Amino acid sequence: LELVSSGEKWGRGPAKDIHSSLKAMVDSPAWHLVKALNTLVSEDGNEIAIDGYAKPRPITAEEKKMIADASKVRSEAQAKKQLSVQHWIGDLPWEEANVRLESQPTANIEGLVGGYTGPGGKTVLPHKAVAKMDFRLVPDMKAADVVPAITAHLAKRGFGDIEVNMSGGYDPTQTAASAPLIQAQISVLKRAGVDPVMWPRSAGSYPGFVFTGEPLKLASGHFGLGHGSGAHAPDEYYVIESTNPKIQGYDGAVMSFVEYLYELGK
């Protein structure tokens, strides 16, 4: 999503960039956006506070056990090192942080754009400011409900001029671990000497709903041998040729899909 604050649409503040000394007598669209953003979340920025926003489906006891088992296998210290973080939200213990990762929607600011962002300073009062945001959804939330909820929430608080532009999005997706598709994946991985760690959901997003949602209602899941990490980061990587016999390279990853298709055909 894009949330856009402009002096022209607001009817206050400048319709073009002006000298910052004039802030003494002219409203700021940038500050207007900051104040609007602040209403969307709790004081610490970690809980969504949008009026009428859909609540996530509670995770089941089976899903909680899956998370607990996975948390025992995955190293918390390694995860923090990989992500370059020192604390989880609210200093949650490892298992509870993973429960939150698997069960809670998010309101994330990807970037803020407005005015001068080059080296040094420039005394300017920007006429427009933009917040790039993403809202991760979890079952049973709907992408179509997000923009109307945000728009109504902002209007109720005097921010009806803020544009809420949806550039893309889709519904959440989930497939049960008991599905034949997932069981076929597990069989192939175990034959390759891998004891898979099972999570109820992928923390990231992909348009799996086109398969798992109406009208198809099919299973969908991620699969493949090989190794990569750092998704969407500057140092994202994937192993093409492996020097570790326990890790497949690109060729081994491709062949794992051949084995997978054979397993599905049984």
Question: What are these model-derived regions, one by one?
Answer:
Residues E110, D134, V147, T151, ...:
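Generic hydrophobic alpha-helical scaffold/packing signal
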Residues T173-R191:
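Short, low-order "capping/linker" segments at domain edges
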Residues L1, S6-L112, M141-D161:
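Acidic-enriched catalytic cores of C-N bond-cleaving enzymes acting on peptides and small amides
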Residues G114-A149:
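C-terminal catalytic subdomain
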Residues F135-V138, E163-S178, R201-A203, P207:
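A short beta-alpha structural unit
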Residues V4-S6, W10-G13, L33, S103, ...:
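Zn-dependent metallopeptidase/amidohydrolase metal-coordination segment
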Residues A149-I162, M166-Y170, G204, G226-S229:
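Active/binding-pocket-proximal capping segment
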Residues E8-W10, G114-T117, R136-D140, G169, ...:
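Short, glycine-/Ser/Thr-/acidic-enriched flexible segments
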